């Protein structure tokens, strides 16, 4: 057992021009979760994002979608975590993952940023603490490192987008276990699905 998740952060870029792009897979996850639970996200400028509180497995969980650009996500995460006294190891950051194919989602505890600017900024904002959980939503890789920036900022074709949504749905089913602190069960369910 590990510390239970009490804050879920969905990474993305603000603005309609970035809506439903591959890079916003984390943001889409949190927005869909809030919508499914009937809890609208509210613009909360003091925390640099849209926030709400949900109940999962009888526990309060804070949701956050930063209104900062991806590379400044740490400002929002640190603000909300500090305000509610949420330790880094109680945070789950949901983000796009180039190294996983569309249709795949993986959980991970701690580690580096892997070149992801949102994770890099969160690690720095949390005092170089890397022990937060990550839900990695696969978006695939364009095959050429020089194409990554344009690739992640584009919308996925419809068939690929459906695969990303399927992975998000599978990941959502693990949240009750994560809130209970049962990362092993959540990983087993998600990684063998």
Curated annotation (Swiss-Prot):
Localisation per UniProt entry: Cytoplasm
BP terms from Gene Ontology: protein quality control for misfolded or incompletely synthesized proteins; rescue of stalled ribosome
EC class name: hydrolase
Pfam families documented for this protein: Pept_tRNA_hydro (PF01195)
PANTHER family: PEPTIDYL-TRNA HYDROLASE (PTHR17224:SF1)
Subunit structure as annotated in this protein's UniProt entry: Monomer.
Protein name per Swiss-Prot or TrEMBL: Peptidyl-tRNA hydrolase
């Amino acid at each position: 057992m590990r510390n239970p998740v009490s804050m879920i952060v969905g990474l993305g870029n603000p603005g309609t021009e970035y809506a439903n792009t591959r890079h916003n897979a984390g943001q889409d996850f949190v927005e869909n979760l809030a919508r499914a639970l009937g809890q609208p996200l509210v613009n909360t400028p003091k925390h640099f994002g849209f926030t709400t509180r949900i109940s999962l497995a009888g526990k309060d969980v804070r949701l956050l979608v930063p209104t900062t650009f991806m590379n400044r996500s740490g400002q929002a995460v640190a603000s909300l975590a500090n305000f509610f006294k949420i330790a880094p190891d109680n945070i789950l950051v949901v983000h796009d993952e180039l190294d996983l194919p569309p249709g795949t989602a993986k959980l991970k505890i701690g580690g580096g940023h892997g070149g992801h600017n949102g994770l890099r900024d969160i690690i720095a904002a949390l005092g170089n603490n890397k022990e937060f959980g990550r839900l990695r939503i696969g978006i695939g890789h364009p095959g050429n490192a020089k194409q990554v920036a344009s690739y992640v900022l584009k919308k996925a074709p419809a068939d690929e987008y459906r695969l990303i949504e399927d992975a998000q749905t599978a990941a959502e089913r693990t949240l009750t276990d994560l809130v209970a602190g049962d990362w092993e069960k959540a990983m087993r369910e998600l990684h063998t699905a």
